[in-house]
């Protein structure tokens, strides 16, 4: 999976897909009451990127629904995964449950259209810290209460704050989540990051019977040398400001026979058995 990073403007979706991304990440900003308002990162962000692009969240969902709906004029077959970077650190932890309710309802109304949409992308909920786990509980409660629990099959969980992996496992146990879990490891593209935690996560992913990490991606990679390093370690995905660079690396002799781009037929919740 090649995740285009910080794709917050509607017009940038096609741009990142044209560069080779088959997944996009966008930031969701909330008001003080936990209501999702806009797709917006804000300052500071990655080196070499403008942080101010934005869109109204519901309008963004309306557009991305079309982009991921077969036979729609805007349909782009390659886009199979949407990563929602939830800016929960900007609101009180007490509002995390309200935020989860709101995002679930907006997805129901504007993306899935309560069963009337054929939009097919998988959804990855990126939670910054384990202390915000009530967002996940609320999201799942809302799908159940609204009568759409079946959409849980399309939704995965990911904690992005580089926290202790055992602490993350404990929270997933509290929530009763034993599948459909990604684990991110990374840092802003402005800095270098070691591989100790990434290697630990990969070891857990590959441990038989360990159900708290199904997939792993590294972020935010812009240097080809770091992309190569991550691929050698065996990541499932790379988040980048430059999807075209990832494409070029994947075509190199060392990787061409080992990796390919994920398609809709590849389940993002299953461990890869090579």
Swiss-Prot record:
Expressed by the venom gland. GO terms for cellular component: extracellular region. One of its GO terms (molecular function) is phosphoric diester hydrolase activity. It catalyses: an N-(acyl)-sphingosylphosphocholine = an N-(acyl)-sphingosyl-1,3-cyclic phosphate + choline; an N-(acyl)-sphingosylphosphoethanolamine = an N-(acyl)-sphingosyl-1,3-cyclic phosphate + ethanolamine; a 1-acyl-sn-glycero-3-phosphocholine = a 1-acyl-sn-glycero-2,3-cyclic phosphate + choline; a 1-acyl-sn-glycero-3-phosphoethanolamine = a 1-acyl-sn-glycero-2,3-cyclic phosphate + ethanolamine. One of its GO terms (biological process) is lipid catabolic process. InterPro entries: PLC-like_Pdiesterase_TIM-brl. Disulfide bonds join 45-51, 47-190. Belongs to the arthropod phospholipase D family. Class II subfamily. The active site is at 5, 41 (nucleophile). Its main location: secreted. Mg(2+) binds at residues 25, 27, 85. Its EC number is 4.6.1.-. This is Dermonecrotic toxin SdSicTox-betaIIB1bx. Binds 1 Mg(2+) ion per subunit. Dermonecrotic toxins cleave the phosphodiester linkage between the phosphate and headgroup of certain phospholipids (sphingolipid and lysolipid substrates), forming an alcohol (often choline) and a cyclic phosphate. This toxin acts on sphingomyelin (SM). It may also act on ceramide phosphoethanolamine (CPE), lysophosphatidylcholine (LPC) and lysophosphatidylethanolamine (LPE), but not on lysophosphatidylserine (LPS), and lysophosphatidylglycerol (LPG). It acts by transphosphatidylation, releasing exclusively cyclic phosphate products as second products. Keywords: Cytolysis, Dermonecrotic toxin, Disulfide bond, Hemolysis, Lipid degradation, Lipid metabolism, Lyase, Magnesium, Metal-binding, Secreted, Toxin. It is found in: Secreted. It comes from the Eukaryota. Its cofactor is Mg(2+).
